[in-house]
């Protein structure tokens, strides 16, 4: 049971992190300076 809970926590943390990264990329790509600095991130 402890192992299941630990893996669930890890999954939740990973989902939160990927969500935050997606938000950061979106906000970067909508900012022209950041977009110019990171063209590989912004399609």
UniProtKB/Swiss-Prot annotation:
Pfam name, any one: Toxin_8
Key words of the record: Acetylcholine receptor inhibiting toxin, Disulfide bond, Ion channel impairing toxin, Neurotoxin, Postsynaptic neurotoxin, Secreted, Toxin
Region named Lacks the Ser-Xaa-Pro motif that is crucial for potent interaction with nAChR: 30-32
Keyword Secreted: yes
Cellular compartments annotated: Secreted
UniProt note on tissues of expression: Expressed by the venom duct.
Propeptide residues per the UniProt entry: 1-26
GO molecular function annotation: acetylcholine receptor inhibitor activity; ion channel regulator activity; toxin activity
Disulfide bonds: 28-34, 29-42
Cellular component GO terms held in the UniProt record: extracellular region; host cell postsynaptic membrane
InterPro entries registered for this protein in UniProt: Conotoxin_a-typ
Keyword Disulfide bond: yes
Biological role stated in the UniProt entry: Alpha-conotoxins act on postsynaptic membranes, they bind to the nicotinic acetylcholine receptors (nAChR) and thus inhibit them. Has possibly a distinct nAChR binding mode from other alpha-conotoxins, due to a different three residue motif (lacks the Ser-Xaa-Pro motif).
Protein family according to the UniProt entry: Belongs to the conotoxin A superfamily.
Entry text on domains: The cysteine framework is I (CC-C-C). Alpha4/7 pattern.
Protein's name in the database: Alpha-conotoxin-like Leo-A1
């Amino acid at each position: 049971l402890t192992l299941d809970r630990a893996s669930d926590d890890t999954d939740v943390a990973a989902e939160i992190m990927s969500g935050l990264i997606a938000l950061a990329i979106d906000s970067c790509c909508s900012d022209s300076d950041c977009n110019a600095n990171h063209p590989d991130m912004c399609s």
